[in-house]
A protein has these predicted regions:
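Extended hydrophobic leader/signal-anchor segments used for secretion and membrane insertion
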Residues: 1-596
């Protein structure tokens, strides 16, 4: 009978044999202990994972939410589900959401017919036509899972516009996540949607400008020609891109089933201008009932101002103890503040190697243009108003028309992005930021408000694209807006930015009444609020400003001490998995991203 090598039946051999068996076990135990210690050290000193519970940072980061795709225009977006709860005495379910592009209020795939009946919706989904079909992804999902770097601020100081995690000053056991706005020693002013900063020892405020990569990450979609509602087209709802009044843009036409815009001939400047022609919830109901009386005529007064609408906030709920909840969002979530800081994106192909391509944005009645020479690629910025001029950081007048070399050439296809945000003009060509030979910054007037005249639509047509001496085909157009920070504070005991408590409905109605913009005192009643900071004090705000409980509303103290900072949010590493028949734990890889 053979024995294992080294397996002698003596004390020494037995000891060696037992040692040979126990070593792997001991190694395993030691490895587990080391792994636990490393994980503990990593969590304590290097990084930690968090789940976002609320939507105060939406749409940058998602709290508890629903992922939906609009059944009318096909646009994918998220809506809050943070209000849902399991309290049987006060059950609440998100039953409908509103698309940020076409504004269709879409009933979700509710499990119970009685819940659909509370919305006045057909229980036979095939019969309803507009109700979302059975979709497992209409269930509620937990928030984004993010990774937070704990040592970032050991190596360098926190920077403005970072997304930070910290301990809530009034409850150090609770973690908060916001965007860092104010730094130690500064006074932060929130005014007209912008952030202004007064550094320690200085007397004047200056606007805080977002770095380019932060700006791109914070812009929110208002319109996209890739997402069109067939229903609106069928009933004759006017396109949001219209010839400008007196611009002679009759040459523009749609091609390829209205998917593209084309200008076959180009004599002089030929303009297309954006009009914010969005159907209200009531208009949608009437259109679906066959009532076309609500269809607007663009004319000189059709459309409205762009507001701080958040799809994340525009949801309606079904409550167990109520017989009926209106599926139409209330005015408070339709956006009650005018947003003048906008961006225009265009995918365009020009023919020939002469002429100009012109991009335009309007704010406060001032026309800001970027004119690109199709022969040389030179881009030139122009302010079509004598009231404003470009200035440097010291406030001194700068080059009247700064120029930049770009890769744009006639006969090629390019992706262009032109923004007017934080009193600064920027241009991207094929995702590359153009560098101008002078400052592209300016100072807005204190009383900046929307302007309109019959011969100059101003802020009623806040974006435009044109050719001069050239022809072009446009494959895609997008309108984007900046975050609007609402000027409220705990001391004011009001969630309204307007000093006289103007109703949400009154503000929304005024946005659609351009003939009254010059006489109304609505825009003069916008308040500003200040927040002074001391040494090692930081001021945070959420990107979802209307629904964010942040430094503005904490009361005392309205800031975060340095010792309460946990770290910098750097990565969304595990967005929720898409639900399906097998419910595999596979994350939505397309939404894994660095946090900007």
């Amino acid at each position: 009978m053979s024995r294992p090598e080294g397996g002698k039946a003596d004390a020494k051999g037995t000891s060696n044999l037992e040692s040979g068996h126990s070593y792997p076990l001991r190694e395993t135990i030691e490895s587990i202990v080391v792994a636990v210690l490393l994980a503990f050290l990593f969590r304590t000193f290097v990084g930690e994972a968090f789940i976002i519970p609320t939507g105060s940072m939406a749409p940058t980061l998602q709290g508890n939410h629903k992922d939906v795709t609009c059944v009318e225009c096909g646009y994918p977006y998220q809506a809050s589900a943070s209000s849902e709860n399991d309290d049987l005495s006060y059950q609440e379910t998100v039953g409908a959401t509103t698309c940020p592009l076409c504004r269709f209020t879409m009933p979700l795939d509710l499990d119970l017919d009685e819940e659909r009946q509370r919305f006045g919706l057909p229980t036979d989904r095939e019969e309803s036509g507009r109700a979302a079909k059975t979709d497992a992804n209409h269930e509620s999902f937990s928030g984004d899972r993010i990774l937070v770097s704990k040592f970032s601020y050991d190596l360098s100081n926190p920077r403005r516009w970072d997304v930070i995690v910290f301990k809530y000053p009034n409850n150090a056991k609770q973690n908060y996540i916001k965007r860092l706005i104010g730094l130690p020693g500064e006074t932060v002013r929130v005014r007209h949607g912008d952030v202004l900063i007064k550094p320690a020892g200085e007397n004047d405020f200056r606007i805080a400008r977002k770095p380019p990569h932060k700006l791109v990450g914070m812009l929110q979609a208002v319109h996209d020609t890739h997402y069109r509602s067939p229903e609106l087209a069928e009933v004759g709802w006017p396109s949001r891109w219209q010839p400008g009044i007196g611009d002679g843009a009759a040459g523009w036409r749609t091609v390829a089933d209205d998917e593209k815009l084309e200008l076959p001939q180009a004599d002089g400047e030929s303009w297309l201008r954006y009009r914010h022609l969005i159907p209200s919830g009531d208009a949608w109901f009437k259109l679906l009932d066959g009532d076309k009386s609500v269809i607007p005529q663009p004319g000189a007064t059709g459309g409205q101002l762009i507001s701080d609408f958040y799809a994340y906030n525009a949801f309606t709920t079904v409550r167990a103890e109520r017989d009926h909840d209106s599926p139409v969002p209330t005015p408070s979530v339709l956006g009650t503040h005018w947003v003048g800081d906008l961006g225009l994106e265009a995918e365009v192909t020009t023919t020939g190697n002469t002429g100009e391509l012109i991009l335009e944005l309007v704010e406060g009645g001032v026309h800001f243009q970027c004119r690109i020479d199709l022969a040389t690629g030179e881009a030139k910025l122009v302010v079509v108003d004598e009231r404003l001029q470009f200035v440097d950081d010291a406030g001194q007048a700068a080059t009247a028309s700064p120029k930049a070399a770009t890769a744009v050439r006639g006969g090629r296809r390019h992706r262009l992005r032109f923004t007017n945000v934080d009193d600064e003009l920027r241009l991207w060509v094929d995702d590359s930021l153009a560098t101008f030979d002078g400052p592209t910054t300016y100072v807005s007037p204190e009383d900046c408000r929307p302007h309109w005249r019959p011969d100059d639509l101003g802020d009623l047509a806040p974006a435009g694209i044109a050719t001069h001496g050239a022809s072009a085909q446009i494959e895609r157009l997008r309108i984007l807006r900046d975050v609007y920070y609402v000027a409220v504070s705990a001391e004011l005991r009001s969630d309204s930015e307007y000093t006289d408590g103007t109703s949400d409905l009154a503000a929304v109605q005024m946005f659609a009444d351009p003939e009254s913009w010059s006489t109304t005192n609505l825009f003069a009643r916008r308040r500003s609020v200040d927040f002074p900071l001391g040494e090692d004090q930081f001021f945070p705000m959420g990107d979802n400003s209307p629904q964010s409980k942040d430094g503005r509303l904490w009361g005392d103290p309205p800031y975060v001490e340095r010792e309460l900072l946990t770290g910098k949010a750097v990565l969304v590493y595990w967005p929720h998995a898409w639900s399906g028949p097998f419910r595999l734990p596979i994350p939505n890889v397309s939404r894994m991203r660095l946090i900007r």
